[in-house]
Amino acid sequence: LQPVGHSFEEYRDSLVAWAEKAKSLGFKAVKSEVTLNGPYAHSGLNENDERTTEVVAAVRKALGPDIYLMIDVQYRWKDAEEALRTVKDWAEFDIYFLETPVWTDDIKSYAQMHDEAPMKIAAGEWLSTRYEFEDLIINGKIDVAQPDVGRCGGLTEAKKIAKFSQDNNRLSLIHI
């Protein structure tokens, strides 16, 4: 779900409208951007974590309980401690995975997120080698590896990353 608008209300309401449309079209899963702050904040928005939670709650309510919801916060927080202050309370939203809560090179934070967050953790879209993925999977303990075929060395390397993920009981989803 890709938002539009230049205010918090427009942003939230556009994501709710997209969620309702996805539901009406019979989608079984959706990934929603929720970028109200951080390096990739939508239209320069600068909202607090309570507002981020408000958007997640509104999208989940619009989708209902039977559609998988994935949330991409695009490096919203500086570390796991900061992220967990918010996402520990998101269990009620039944999020399938949380994408890129912190910068991908913060392996320690990813491991902590895996251990303490109430949802799967996904990352990897900017990684360029299978060796980086191996580190993120083994030491960062991510649940979902997300290679971007155009960055990770092509389809052959993406397949190797997928195989490594599978061998380590992790999911691998091509990043879109």
Predicted feature residues:
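Short acidic active-site motifs
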Residues: 109, 131-132, 157
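Conserved small/polar residues in nucleotide/adenosyl-binding loops
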Residues: 174-176
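C-terminal structural cap/anchor segments
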Residues: 154-172
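Glycine-rich beta-to-alpha transition loops that act as phosphate-gripper elements at the mouths
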Residues: 71-77, 103-104, 123-130, 153-155
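Glycine-enriched alpha-helix->loop->beta-strand junction motifs that scaffold or abut catalytic
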Residues: 26, 88-96, 114-122, 137-146, ...
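Conserved sugar-transfer catalytic core signal across GT-A, GT-B, and GT-C glycosyltransferases
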Residues: 86, 132, 161
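Metal-dependent enolase-superfamily TIM-barrel catalytic cores that perform enediolate-based chemistry
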Residues: 2-111, 116
